[in-house]
Structures are given as structure tokens and as C-alpha cells.
């Protein structure tokens, strides 16, 4: 038996905001009677940028900055039209990127 799945992938730089957004989506989806699988934590991307502190020489003096992207996956099994309508209305913080696949 094939079942419909909606996959929601959230990305953000702050893990607390991503987790807070996931709980909002789970509460909204479960309110319509849909089954929710997750949240599944995906590997965190870490981007390290190294720059020289001095302008001309002194290569030994460097500074490193890093940017971490936290990701979570959520699956909603057999979503109804009401589930999709509720998910469109969920207000998420500005630091979260959402990607929905059916």
C-alpha cells in the first residue's frame, strides 16, 4: 500500500529556533489528525572561514570564523487538504528556511 508523504525540511543557524519551529508544525499537523514522523535531526553543516588578521604579512596570525547550519526533517503521513491549509498559516521565525516536498 502506497501512502502519501509530505517531507518538511527546516534549516537555520540557531538550533533553538529550528526546534521551536518544528514543535509549532507538529502541533498544527496533529491538530488536523495527521500522523507525524520525526523530528529527524540531519547532519549539521559547518563552514569555517579563515582570514589573516594583518593586512600585508604575518601569516601566522589568523582568525577563524564558523557558521553552522542546523537541519531537521519532518514527515507527515497521509496529509489531508486541511493539514496543508493549516501548515500554510503557521507563522515561523525569520531565521528558519523551510522546504516542503510532496
From Swiss-Prot:
Gene3D superfamilies: Ribosomal protein S10 domain (3.30.70.600). One of its GO terms (molecular function) is structural constituent of ribosome. The keyword Ribonucleoprotein applies. SMART domains: Ribosomal_S10. GO terms for cellular component: ribonucleoprotein complex; ribosome. Keywords: Ribonucleoprotein, Ribosomal protein. It comes from the Bacteria. PROSITE patterns: RIBOSOMAL_S10 (PS00361). One of its GO terms (biological process) is translation. It holds the Pfam family Ribosomal_S10. Part of the 30S ribosomal subunit. Belongs to the universal ribosomal protein uS10 family. Involved in the binding of tRNA to the ribosomes. This is Small ribosomal subunit protein uS10. It comes from Mycoplasma capricolum subsp. capricolum (strain California kid / ATCC 27343 / NCTC 10154). The gene is rpsJ.
Amino acid at each position: 500500500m502506497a501512502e502519501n508523504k509530505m517531507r518538511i525540511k527546516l534549516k537555520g543557524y540557531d538550533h533553538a529556533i529550528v526546534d521551536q519551529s518544528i514543535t509549532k508544525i507538529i502541533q498544527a499537523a496533529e491538530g488536523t489528525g495527521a500522523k507525524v514522523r520525526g523530528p529527524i535531526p540531519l547532519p549539521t553543516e559547518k563552514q569555517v572561514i579563515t582570514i589573516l588578521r594583518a593586512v600585508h604579512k604575518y601569516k601566522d596570525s589568523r582568525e577563524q570564523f564558523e557558521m553552522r547550519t542546523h537541519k531537521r526533517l519532518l514527515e507527515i503521513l497521509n496529509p489531508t487538504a486541511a493539514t496543508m491549509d493549516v501548515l500554510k498559516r503557521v507563522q515561523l521565525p525569520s531565521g528558519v528556511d523551510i522546504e516542503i516536498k510532496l
